[in-house]
Amino acid sequence: MKHIRNFCIIAHIDHGKSTLADRLIQSCGGVTQREFHDQMLDSMDIERERGITIKSNTVTLNYTAKDGEAYQLNLIDTPGHVDFSHEVRRSLMACEGALMVVDASQGVEAQTVANLYLALEYDLELLPVINKIDLPAADVDRVRGEIDEDLGLDPFVAIPVSAKTGQGIEDVLEGIVKNLPAPKGDPKAPLKALVFDAFFDKYRGVILQCRVMEGTLKPKDEIHFMHADRDFTVDELGYNQFKLVPKKELTAGEVGYIVAGVKTVQDIEIGDTITLANRPADEPIPGYQPARQVVFSSVYPMSTDEYQDLTKALEKLSINDAALTFEKDSSAALGFGYRCGFLGLLHLDVVQERLQREFDIGLVISAPSVQYKIKLKDGTTQDVDNPTYWPDPSTIDSVSEPYIKAQILIPEEYVGPVMELCREHRSESQTMNYLSAGRLEVTSEMPLGEVLFDFYGKLKMITRGYGSFDYVPIEYRKTDIVKVDILVNKEPVDALAYLVHRDKSRARAMHYCEQLAEAIPRHQFKIPIQGAIGGTVIARTTIAPYRKDVTAKLYGGDVSRKKKLLEKQKKGKAKMKQFGSVNIPQKAFISVLRTDKD
C-alpha cells in the first residue's frame, strides 16, 4: 500500500489541468504514442472543443521512481467549473493529495482559492505546480509570492513546469511520490468503498469508479449500497488504464472500476458507500452530499413530432449524468416538453448542446429560473421554479429566493466598476480583502437569480478578462418577486411568462415586448403586445397593421362613396381585432428567449 498514490489535479479554468494530465500519462507510458491524443481524459467531443472538463475521469499509471521503486499512481481528473463542484468534492474524497496548478502568467484566481478551501476541507496534502512557464508573460517569482501570500502554501516546494513542452514533468512525478502521502486503510476490515463516478456502457450497464477505503473486494461478492439501500453482485473489477484491465481483487487504498449489473445511474447514488452484504460496515463514509439542482428551465422540441426523440435523448443523457433531473411539462404555445433541473448555466448549456449534437433535436429553451420558496397566507409553503405554478398574488404572504456568496478576484484598478456591477445585481454586503500586490478579493452576497443571466460575461468584459468568479450557495432570504405575463393581442402566452424582482420587471418586460414586435409579422389589424403583473400593464408596444387601400378601385364619383368604403373597412377591422387570432411564429419565441437580458 505504501507504493500507491491517489491524487487529483485542481486548478482554475484554463490553467492547464488536462494538458498536465496528458504529459503525466505520456511520461508513465500510460498509452502508446499511436493511441495518444490531446485531452486524453476528456471523453466527450464538447469537452475537447470547448477545452473544459465536465466529467471526472480516472486512470491508473505505473511509475518507476529514481530510487528504483515501482509506484501505482491513480490520477483522478476533476472539472474546474463552479457548476461541477460536486464532482470535484467526490473526486477529492477519493484522494490523499492534490496537484494545485497555477498559471505562471495569470497567477492565483478565484477557483484556485475555492478549490484550495475544498481540498483543505478534505484534509488533502497539496503540491503546488506552476504551469505555462514557456509563455513570454510567465513570471514564476511573482506567482511563487502569490502561492505563499494568497494560498499559504510553501512556495519553495512549488514545481515550475510547462505541460505544453514537457519541461519539469519528471520533477512533478518525483514530487508526487515524495510529497504526497500513501493511503491508509486495513485490507482485512469490513469493506468500505466510495463510488465517486459512474459511466454507462451499452453492453455492460453502469461501470462504477470506486476508491476502496477499507477491506477487500472480489468478483462474485454481494455488495450493498448504504444510501440507496440496493444490493448487486460484482461481475468484474479491475483498474482503468484507458481500457478496463480486470484484476482478481481491489484492496484498501486502491482505485478501480466495478461492473455489477447496474442498469442506470438512477439505480444508485454517486457518492454512495459500498459495503459487503454479508459483512457490512457500521457506517458510511462521511461527507456524502447529493447534487443540488439550482437552475430550472423548460425544454421543448422545435417540432412536436420530435417529442418522443427528446424523451429518449433525455433518458440516455441522464444515464450518464446523474445530476440532470426532468419531468413532463406542457405549454399551450409550444406543446409538450420537459421541465429540467441543472447544476448551473454551464450545465444547462452543455446539456442543450449535447441534445442538439448527439441526438440532432432542435430545441426551444425557456428563460432559466431558480427555485423560490413561497409562504402562503394560510400558513402552507410551496417551492416554485416554474411561472406556470405561481400562486395568485393575493394568497402570497412572503417569497424567499436563494442567495449565494460570490468570491471575485480582480486587479485593484477595476474595483469601482466591479462594485457597481455587484450593486446592479442586487448585492447586499460587500467586503474587500487585499491579496498580493495590486490584487483584490471582493466577497459579496447576492441572489442566485441575478447571477444566472449575464453576470459572469459582464464581469469578464469590465475587467478585460482578468476578473475571476466563484460562488457557494448560502441560504434563502425574503424578497419581492413577481410573475410577469406577456400578452399578445390581450391573450397571455404561457411560454413567455417569467419570474423577476419587482425593480427589474419593467425593463425586462419592455425588452420582451420589443423583441416580439420585431419577430411577429404584421396582420390586418393592430396587435398590442403587453407585459403585465396581475391586471397591471407595465410595458407595451404595438404592431401596426397593414393598410389595404379600399378606395383604389373608385374612379371619380362622389366623396360619400369613398367614406362608405372606409367605414366598412373600419367595421371589418374592429371585428377582426375582436375575433382574429395572432399567429406567433416559432422564431419569435427563440429570438426572445435567446437574447434574454436584464
From Swiss-Prot:
This is Elongation factor 4 2. It comes from the Bacteria. Required for accurate and efficient protein synthesis under certain stress conditions. May act as a fidelity factor of the translation reaction, by catalyzing a one-codon backward translocation of tRNAs on improperly translocated ribosomes. Back-translocation proceeds from a post-translocation (POST) complex to a pre-translocation (PRE) complex, thus giving elongation factor G a second chance to translocate the tRNAs correctly. Binds to ribosomes in a GTP-dependent manner. Coiled coil: none annotated. Its EC number is 3.6.5.n1. It is a peripheral membrane protein. One of its GO terms (cellular component) is plasma membrane. PANTHER family: TRANSLATION FACTOR GUF1 HOMOLOG, CHLOROPLASTIC, TRANSLATION FACTOR GUF1-RELATED. GTP binds at D14, H15, G16, K17, S18, T19, N131, K132, I133, D134. It holds the Pfam family LepA_C. Keywords: Cell inner membrane, Cell membrane, GTP-binding, Hydrolase, Membrane, Nucleotide-binding, Protein biosynthesis. HAMAP family: LepA. GO terms for biological process: positive regulation of translation. It is found in: Cell inner membrane. Gene3D superfamilies: 3.30.70.240, Elongation factor 4, C-terminal domain, Elongation Factor G (Translational Gtpase), domain 3, P-loop containing nucleotide triphosphate hydrolases, Translation factors. PROSITE patterns: G_TR_1 (PS00301), G_TR_2 (PS51722).
